[in-house]
Regions:
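HhH-family (HhH-GPD) DNA N-glycosylase catalytic core used in base-excision repair
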Residues: 1-331
């Protein structure tokens, strides 16, 4: 059930547009949206609590900031079943608002997976994790260009480097979030703004020429990618994304996991993921090939299995070489 609380005619310039709905089944707001964030000071996604998340985005290239909350329900109501309220500000708010339920996985159904024979083959710790985290959903934001920039900046570097670069580039090139968004939040740049980013800014942010060139190539195909974002098949989207030089299987999977709620996309060539998954199943490090072999029984739902492993609290041993931050500003 969905209910638009504030109509177009009733909304004033400074009042938010609102959308409230009852989720189908349990929903954990913070756990579902956390995958979109990059640290506590992310300029485009702030998790302020399990039931309060701020995001910024664009709708038809118009700025939007939005706050997801869970209004208090009837006494005794399971918190995972309470309504979701979204309040949005900015020129793109009313157009974006009907897409808000997809951001928290409203169309993501685990039912086929939960009732499948493959689910019964999951290791017991993952079955237990699924029962302990019934509100975990896969978000489908649809913001292909925005997620592409995040994924490209994360190529071949540490998370610290990527986060630092993203924050700096948005601080220099992005406009402040509309409405009462938390301090420091900004709206992702438009394709035109990215294309105008001077080379010295990429350099100063610590982004090497290969990654900045990939962002530029992506933004030069912005119109085509905005159409591609409407394709509901994440596998087709992954394939199409890889036609852009500099975007491979890892980057494409990282994008569609967030934009399309991709239940099967696996981030191969990730510096940590193969070992992480292999340690869970084999209690030993392993290759991408071994990871895919281990996940094969759950094809069609492999990303769900990866999310369950992460939600289980599994940690692989921390010995071995670490990827150290690199300073590309002197290259």
């Amino acid at each position: 059930m969905t209910t638009e609380v504030t109509t177009r005619g009733a909304r004033t310039e400074h009042a938010p547009a609102r959308w409230r709905w009852t989720p189908r089944g349990p929903l954990h707001l913070g756990q579902t949206l956390r995958v979109l964030g990059r640290g506590a000071e992310d300029p485009t996604c702030r998790i302020l609590g399990e039931d309060c998340v701020w995001i910024t985005t664009r709708w038809n290239r118009l700025p939007v900031s939005a706050r997801f909350t869970r209004p208090a329900g009837v006494t005794g109501t399971n918190p995972l079943h309470r309504d979701v309220l979204v309040e949005a500000w900015g020129p793109g708010a009313e157009g974006w608002l009907p897409t808000a339920p997809r951001w928290v996985g409203h169309e993501d159904s685990w039912e086929d997976f939960d009732s499948s024979a493959a689910f019964a083959e999951l290791p017991h710790p993952l079955v237990r994790t699924r029962h302990e985290h019934p509100g975990l959903r896969l978000p489908a934001t649809g913001n292909l260009l925005e997620r592409a920039v995040v994924a490209i900046l994360e190529q071949r570097v540490t998370a610290i480097e990527a986060v630092r670069a993203y924050r700096a580039l948005l601080r220099w090139n992005a406009e402040p979030a509309p409405g009462p968004a938390p301090h420091g939040m900004r709206v992702p740049p438009t394709p035109e703004q990215w294309r105008r980013t001077p080379s010295w800014q990429w350099h100063r942010a610590g982004v090497d020429p290969a990654r900045s060139a990939t962002v530029m190539r992506t933004m030069h195909r912005a119109a085509a990618l905005e159409r591609l974002a409407l394709d509901p098949d994440p596998a087709r989207v992954r394939t199409a994304l890889q036609s852009i030089q500099g975007i491979g299987p890892w980057t494409a999977a990282e994008i569609t996991q967030c934009t399309h709620g991709d239940p099967d996309g696996v981030s191969v060539h990730d510096y940590h993921l193969a070992d992480y998954v292999c340690w869970f199943f084999d209690h030993a490090p392993g290759s991408d090939e071994r990871m895919l072999e281990l996940l094969e029984p759950w094809r069609g739902h492999r990303q769900r299995v990866v999310r369950l492993i992460k939600a289980s609290g599994h940690r692989k041993p921390s010995f071995g070489p670490r990827l150290s931050p690199q300073d590309h500003r002197h290259h």
